[in-house]
Every structure is written in structure tokens, then in C-alpha cells.
Amino acid sequence: MSCLSRLNASAAPWEPPVARAMAVEQYCPPPQSLLPPPPLPPVAVPTTCGCAACLQGCFVPVGVQAAFPHAAAGCAPPPPVMPVMIVYRVVQPPPPAAHATRCQITEIEDGGGVETAKAVDGDEPQPFIRTVRSTRRRKAAAIRLPKAFRAALLPPPPPPCALGFTATTTSLMIRNIPNKFLKARLMAILDQHCADENGKCHRRGGGGGRSVVKSEYDFFYVPIDFKTGFNKGYAFVNMTTATAARRLRAFLQDHRWDAAMSGKVCDVVPAAIQGLDAFVAHFSASCFPCRTKEFLPVWFEPPRDGEQQTKAHVVGRLVVRPR
């Protein structure tokens, strides 16, 4: 049978239905448009939440897993994440320690009295009150100089008035005398001093009728070592006035005995016994075991001034020991 249509000679030939079903369908894309392409359908993928359903191999669509990964599998959602809380605690300062009772301090007032200060519980310490011991320790720690330099930094010695000299001091102790000097030689030095000072006073006075204080002495004693026959390095003299005593001290103080070939430096200080009567009463009951009266104390009448003749009176008892 002919496959050509008798109705229309120009029409396409007719094909049986089986051949049409076996024809390959080709996809023709739609024309280009301005809208974005539609999304792809969800794909089933395994979840990785770690629950029991997930471990058995259940699958959750991708769209559902992105929002609620445990909803499709029937798992309980995890607990919500708790927010981080920062707690600040205010720490109170420790209470102040209880004030302890301080020790008792005794201070010496300027007038000689003693003032005692007792500490009371709760009173505040005074930072400006310092003891004498702590002040000395700080000064000693601050000064780290050699001994020679520390001696040079010491304050100067007090004036003569602070060493015991008063307006009534007449008796003197002459120290650091050469041991070979005997009484006669020392008396010659005193006589020469008195004569020179009296001559100066008369020249200054000029005969104007003013009273002149003379330099003269009425007691003298040089202790002697009876075994060696030398003096013990000191002597006692009593001047008739305090003015004469100050003149003698100014003459002999710090005197060097270079003429006697001695390195001693003379020192003059007030004697423990003051006055002629006190010297005579002190040495009258003394015994001197020697063979000559030249070693005994003497007092003079009238006082010696380096010019006029005087009479010497021996004080004490001479005791002669048998050989």
C-alpha cells in the first residue's frame, strides 16, 4: 500500500504510532529571559548531627537540614547556648589593725625637770618625735669617714667658763709638768709671771688713782715621788684673786716645754680644793715620808708677787723612815 496521501500530495508521509513513540525527544531551551532560573529540587543527603537517627542512616532534605537539622529526623534539639555572664565582685579593704599601746617615753626638759609621756590606746603616733638614740644612729650611719676626718668634724671645746672656771675660782691645778722640775724652779716661773703682770698693770694704770689687781700667790705644792725624787707631773697653786688666776691660766695654758727638752703640753684647770684655808686644812693632817721639807706644801705670808720678800710656812708632818 502506498504511503502517500491521496488528499494532499504535498503533505508529509504518514508514520505508524510505534515509530513515533520511539522517536528521541530533544529538549529545546526556552528563549532567553530576564528572570533568574528556578531553583533545583532538594536532594537527599545524610546528616551529620551525631544522634541515634542519624547514625542509622536517615536522610534529611538539604533545605530542611539547613534550618532545622534535627526536626526531620525526630531528634530532640540541643540545649540553647547560654550567654556568657561576667560577674564583678567588689572587694572591701581589710579593716585597720588595732593600735597597740606604745612604750613609755621619758624626756628631759630644759629646766632640769623630767616629763613622762604615756601612750593611750587609739592615739595616733607622732612622726616628728624622735629619740636621741635613733638620731645618733642615723648620724653615725650617714658619716662613714675615717677616724682622723671624724675628729676634725667634732665641735670645738667649750669656753673656759664651761670647764669649771667661775668668778670665785682662785686655786689652780697645773698639769703636764716636766718630771724633772722641782719646787724651786716652778716657783721661779711663777715669780717671774707675777712680776711681769704687775708691771703691766702699773703701766696701764699710769698713777691715775685706779685700783690695780695684783698677780700674787699664797700657796704652792708640788707632789713628789719619794722613790725617784721626781715630781708626779702636776702642781697646785692658789692665787689671791680670780683675776690673777685667769692671768696665770692664760700664761701657762697650752705651753710647750721645749726648753726643758720635753714634749708635754701644759694644761691648767680649776683645783678640786679652793682657797688657802681649805688647802691648809687638807694637808695639815698629812704625813710625808721623806728626809727634807722641800717636798712639803707651803703657804706664804705675805703673798708672793715676784718682788717683795715673804716667809714660807710648811704644811703637814715630816716622817723620817729609818734606812
Curated annotation (Swiss-Prot):
GO molecular function list: RNA binding
UniProt-listed InterPro entries: Mei2-like_Rrm_C, RBD_domain_sf
GO cellular component entries: ribonucleoprotein complex
Name under which the protein is recorded: Protein MEI2-like 6
Species, as recorded: Oryza sativa subsp. japonica (Rice)
Highest classification ranks of the organism: Eukaryota, Viridiplantae, Streptophyta, Embryophyta, Tracheophyta
